[in-house]
Amino acid sequence: MRALRLHAPAPVETRPLVLENVPDLTPGPGQILVKVSACGICRTDLHVVEGELPVVRPLVIPGHQVAGTVVGAGTGAEALLGRRVGIGWLHRTCGSCRFCVGGRENLCDAPEFTGWTVDGGFATSILADADFVYELPDGFSDVVAAPLLCAGIIGYRALRLTGLAGRPSGFRGARLGLYGFGAAGHIAIQIARARGADVYVMTRDRERHQALAEELGAAWVGGARDIPPSKLDAAIIFAPAGELIPAGLAALDKGGTLVLGGIHMSDSPPIPYELLYQERVVRSVANNTRNDGREFLAEAARIPVTTHVRTFGLEEANDALIALKTDAIRGAGVLVVA
């Protein structure tokens, strides 16, 4: 099989991912072997490649938004043979810690993550735990489905953590802010608008991100540091920029919630207490549960969500990550593998 391996973390401009021939994979008990068709690129992949997330697995193969077909199965996983499946960030959890037992497996004490602690989908094949994959809805091709498997699922969980669903009217009529409008943002706006929210988008790049936000029905679009015209009931920061936290808090109405949607984010500057006062809340998103993924994919199929993608070949992965780093991708980037 062919795979892109990271020999040592380095700026992506130095092209640290190397396409190599590596031994073929054999699934063990409870595992499946997936022929990769497409793999989305994510800012977390960039954090792995450039070393902002520490090296856990030497020569790791990145990639955690994988769509493909099951071509092999270990004992106990044979029922998935021939199925189209999606593989996300959460590779496996321990199942026995107090967080797993309590229904919060996203906070597992001993998790494994696709493309970071175990090999991911920047390859022609991948192994996955059969209990942690998703069956893909028929309405989505593999290329279109790939960004749903992290950007979509994390966006869905971030929307849940806003607490807007708990309002008497739910999302209907709520004012939601989105800071950053890449892969996750352009999916989250579709879910929020389908639920009836008015979405205010603060993001860079007029030609790409702001224009796409307008196409997808944002109530208002401005620059990353612009102040929205109305106080927000909740906001999500998808950009990995901690310096946006004070601005996000300042944009909230009383009792509002600011959700930090990234696995990695730069440090926040000091936050004046007056920005937190009147019961404003800041909370982070930590991974996702399998139920998040199942519920999101079902809702995405009902709406239906449309992913806007820019495709690259497997051998172009370094170029794809450079494009992601420089905000040159409108919507989501996807490696087409087969």
Task: Annotate each predicted stretch with a short phrase.
Residues 82, 140-225:
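Mid-domain Rossmann-like dinucleotide-binding core that forms the NAD(H)/NADP(H) cofactor-binding site
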Residues 93-179:
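NAD(P)H dinucleotide-binding glycine-rich loop of Rossmann-like/cofactor-binding domains
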Residues 1-3, 290-338:
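C-terminal hydrophobic helical "lid"/dimerization subdomain
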Residues 202-206, 238, 286:
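N-terminal Rossmann-fold cofactor-binding loop
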Residues 164-175, 200, 210-281:
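Glycine-rich cofactor phosphate-binding loops and adjacent beta1-alpha1 units
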Residues 23-39, 52-98, 137-139:
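Glycine-rich beta-strand-centered segment in the early N-terminal region that forms part
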